């Protein structure tokens, strides 16, 4: 019986430490996968890379990073749902971004300037690398 009462605090401590360890590294794993996918996409020479997209980074100054990532996800979804190229990579990227982005946002295309898919992916890669360096 005495052994059990001594083990409980140790087990609780181990559980707390491991859960912190796992949650602390989730950011790294997700960001690594996003960066790898972005590296693959930006290295490709594909006509889809010149498709027009809303410039989600030309948002007002008070826009949060989560809103910007949400808008990027919306644009990626719009591309891979309406074009057959790069679907696997763009959907994977969208899925990974959704974990870092806010759940609701809007892209008002009438007021938003346009860019290309390649520019969107390059800027997203820069942001993700900066975020990874701080993780």
From Swiss-Prot:
Question: Where located?
Answer: Secreted
Pfam families (UniProt xref): IL4 (PF00727)
Q: Which GO terms describe its molecular function?
A: cytokine activity; growth factor activity; interleukin-4 receptor binding
Report the GO terms under cellular component: extracellular space
Q: Which residues form the signal peptide?
A: 1-24
Per the record, the GO terms for biological process are: B cell activation; immune response; interleukin-4-mediated signaling pathway; negative regulation of inflammatory response; positive regulation of DNA-templated transcription; positive regulation of macroautophagy; regulation of immune response
Q: Sorted alphabetically, which keywords does the UniProt record give?
A: B-cell activation, Cytokine, Disulfide bond, Glycoprotein, Growth factor, Secreted, Signal
Superkingdom, taxonomy of origin: Eukaryota
The disulfides recorded in the entry are 27-135, 48-85, 70-105
Glycosylation is annotated at: 62, 96
Q: Which InterPro entries match?
A: 4_helix_cytokine-like_core, IL-4, IL-4/IL-13, IL-4/IL-13_CS
Where is this chain primarily localised?
secreted
Return the similarity comment: Belongs to the IL-4/IL-13 family.
Question: What is the role of this chain?
Answer: Participates in at least several B-cell activation processes as well as of other cell types. It is a costimulator of DNA-synthesis. It induces the expression of class II MHC molecules on resting B-cells. It enhances both secretion and cell surface expression of IgE and IgG1. It also regulates the expression of the low affinity Fc receptor for IgE (CD23) on both lymphocytes and monocytes. Positively regulates IL31RA expression in macrophages. Stimulates autophagy in dendritic cells by interfering with mTORC1 signaling and through the induction of RUFY4.
Its recorded name reads Interleukin-4
* Source organism of the structure: Cervus elaphus (Red deer)
Q: What is the lineage of its organism?
A: Eukaryota, Metazoa, Chordata, Craniata, Vertebrata
């Amino acid at each position: 019986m005495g052994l059990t009462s001594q083990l409980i605090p140790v087990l609780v401590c181990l559980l707390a430490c491991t859960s912190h360890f796992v949650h602390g590294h989730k950011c790294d794993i997700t960001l690594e996968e996003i960066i790898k996918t972005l590296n693959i996409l930006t290295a490709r020479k594909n006509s889809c890379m010149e498709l027009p997209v809303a410039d989600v980074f030309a948002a007002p100054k008070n826009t949060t990073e989560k809103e910007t990532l949400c808008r990027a996800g919306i644009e990626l979804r719009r591309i891979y749902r309406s074009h057959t190229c790069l679907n696997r990579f763009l959907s994977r990227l969208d899925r990974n971004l959704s974990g870092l982005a806010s759940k609701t946002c809007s892209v008002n295309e009438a007021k938003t300037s346009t860019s290309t898919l390649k520019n969107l992916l390059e800027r997203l890669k820069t942001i993700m690398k900066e975020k990874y360096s701080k993780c």
